[in-house]
Amino acid sequence: MSGTIENNISNQSGSIAVAPAGLNWVSSVVTASTVTVVAGNGYWINTTSNACTITLPSSASAGDTIIFGDYARTWGTNGIVIDSNGLNYQGDDDTFDVEYGTDGQSVEIVYSGATKGWIP
């Protein structure tokens, strides 16, 4: 997408262009019961045959992003479990796993820093 800047409060002119944010979608669909993921990627997770435990990176930088999508709309039957791998998740330490189980759901998580960790 691109366009022209006109009629703005500071009377500026020029052009704009929108570029992708740098997230890469992994081309193969995850069907395994476990997967270790990498920041900067999007993953289609197919839980038709089994639930999937997703292990997050053991280190992260503020702004790191990962997206998961329900490829076959089956998370309600076989959900995903996120293992935060030693980092905080929504401010909670890594003593529990986070579960998502809604058909058709997608989850985008961003690393905010050590205090809150990964935040959806």
Question: Which role fits each region the language model picked out?
Answer:
Residues S2, S28, G91, Y100-T102:
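Short solvent-exposed loop/turn micro-motifs enriched in small/polar/acidic residues
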Residues T4-D83, A114-P120:
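Exposed extracellular interaction/assembly regions and N-terminal maturation sites
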Residues Y43-I45, T95-E99:
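Beta-strand-rich interaction surfaces with strong enrichment in secreted/lumenal proteins
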Residues C52, I80, F96-V98, V107:
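Residue-level detector of beta-strand structural context in well-folded domains
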Residues P57, V98-G101:
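Short, charge-rich binding segments
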Residues D83-D93:
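Short edge-strand/loop segments of extracellular domains
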Residues Y100-P120:
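Low-complexity acidic/polar repeat-biased segments
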